[in-house]
Amino acid sequence: MPMTDAFQVRVPRVSSSTAGDIAASSITTRGALPRPGGMPVSMSRGTSPEVALIGVYEISKILTAPRRLEVTLANVVNVLSSMLQMRHGMICILDSEGDPDMVATTGWTPEMAGQIRAHVPQKAIDQIVATQMPLVVQDVTADPLFAGHEDLFGPPEEATVSFIGVPIKADHHVMGTLSIDRIWDGTARFRFDEDVRFLTMVANLVGQTVRLHKLVASDRDRLIAQTHRLEKALREEKSGAEPEVAEAANGSAMGIVGDSPLVKRLIATAQVVARSNSTVLLRGESGTGKELFARAIHELSPRKGKPFVKVNCAALPESVLESELFGHEKGAFTGALNMRQGRFELAHGGTLFLDEIGEITPAFQAKLLRVLQEGEFERVGGNRTLKVDVRLVCATNKNLEEAVSKGEFRADLYYRIHVVPLILPPLRERPGDIPKLAKNFLDRFNKENKLHMMLSAPAIDVLRRCYFPGNVRELENCIRRTATLAHDAVITPHDFACDSGQCLSAMLWKGSAPKPVMPHVPPAPTPLTPLSPAPLATAAPAAASPAPAADSLPVTCPGTEACPAVPPRQSEKEQLLQAMERSGWVQAKAARLLNLTPRQVGYALRKYDIDIKRF
């Protein structure tokens, strides 16, 4: 093996006894190494194949043990010090810039070992890294690579200090160096070639271990950083979402005003329904906020941020509705000058809200059914089939069950859209929300008109007692009309139209109760009077009837008796029919509404010869 050119440099020497003390301070075994069976192995000046094999075996056990890399490397150099006739040993792992990142040593005093990182022979290490070849220096005191590092190797004991360094490589990349130094007296007892081969084998094992440790450390750092990022994002999302969730729980985030139990349950159901892509059917009287709930479901769903497209099916004739929903090709009909996308295409990836779906004709129902079943359609005048991904929300105030029984509405379409029905209660069933709604509408009016009007407590009481057959929409109109015509900034009962006999509800429903339009949400405000047990001719005892809530006391609007807060009392048969329709023709549910037993309801059905509707 070629040696480096050297030149003599005089350095201070100390006694042999001192050098021996320094070397012995970190060498645990000198002269013999235990065999696996317990017998010692005699050490020679060179590294024999037997000793090398045992050394590789011992070092491989250290390298595969689950310890920190610093501890592992320190154990390796300690084993080397027990096997080789060496004074000092060093494993230096480099960082990406080529500077010492981790140094494990043996043979130095604790004081010197603590400063070794700042005194490593950097020039020698750089040459090993640059050439990727072992470096053997017979006399470090005479080699310029070690100039300035004489103190690092200690007193030479009247002999020459030699240096052997090999690169630590993995995947053809130098990751550091493994080096030792020893006393060389110039005789043939020292076989540098054998030591270089042995140290190269050890360095290769160390290189693989360092590479694995760095990969694990890199993955760990990446996972820790990713965890920190996710935790930070979660904290930010949680801090930003907590008010949003709280608002959604009471409906304010969705624009829904009301904190009655009915509204809270409906909002909670809407939040659950919004998570899926199931079709939703919103049912309720006109003015109960079906479009508001449809938009809320869209905003709470994963499709938030995608299009929300709405179509009023009752406002368009069939020919126009088909073109509106499916689009048309250029020249499909007179006036079709350009191709036009339909609402289904515009809502791709989002939500399509079909209001008043109960008003479409049976012929168009078949076309709509195909889109709901297959998710595909053709534009008017076209022959290319288009596929869309749309979440459908429908709404109606029509009795679809009755329409199905009369053949006015297809049963297959009914079952297709009646996947998740949400029944919106009329305003008269939640009078406790009226004050909050009224204040909300008045605040909007004030903001639009830059006013500061208020509702007096007696005025709120008047609103709570009114019937509002037009529900929330009528309440909003009432507030706007009253605020517009009020003479003062504070609205009083005398400012309402019913005080002067101009109540729209009284004019609309004068002398008769409104005709039920929904099987589940009747417009009549009168709570059902419990039917009497058989025979039904006698009234039920007063104790059997639940006391009406204060919110639903039968009072009339002030100033006129024509405003029917309570429409005329229904007959027992009408009450029974209404309860059955509200309960979906389930006798047990109807019995609970009437405060009767299912057996009594069954008797009443037979008495009045009422057939059970089945769908």
Curated annotation (Swiss-Prot):
Residues that coordinate or bind a divalent metal cation: 498, 503
A GO molecular-function descriptor: metal ion binding
SUPFAM superfamilies: GAF domain-like (SSF55781), P-loop containing nucleoside triphosphate hydrolases (SSF52540)
GO biological process: nitrogen fixation; phosphorelay signal transduction system
GAF domain ranges (all copies): 68-210
SMART domains (UniProt xref): AAA, GAF
Induction: NifA transcriptional activity seems to be controlled by both the general nitrogen regulatory (ntr) system and the O(2)-regulatory (FNR) system.
Keywords attached to this entry: Activator, ATP-binding, DNA-binding, Metal-binding, Nitrogen fixation, Nucleotide-binding, Transcription, Transcription regulation, Two-component regulatory system
Span list, region Inter-domain linker: 485-572
DNA-binding region extent: 587-606
Binding-site list for ATP: 284-291, 347-356
Domain Sigma-54 factor interaction: 256-484
C-terminal DNA-binding domain: annotated segments: 573-615
Subunit structure: Interacts with sigma-54.
Cited function: Required for activation of most nif operons, which are directly involved in nitrogen fixation.
Name under which the protein is recorded: Nif-specific regulatory protein
Lineage: Bacteria, Pseudomonadati, Pseudomonadota, Alphaproteobacteria, Hyphomicrobiales
Gene that specifies this protein: nifA
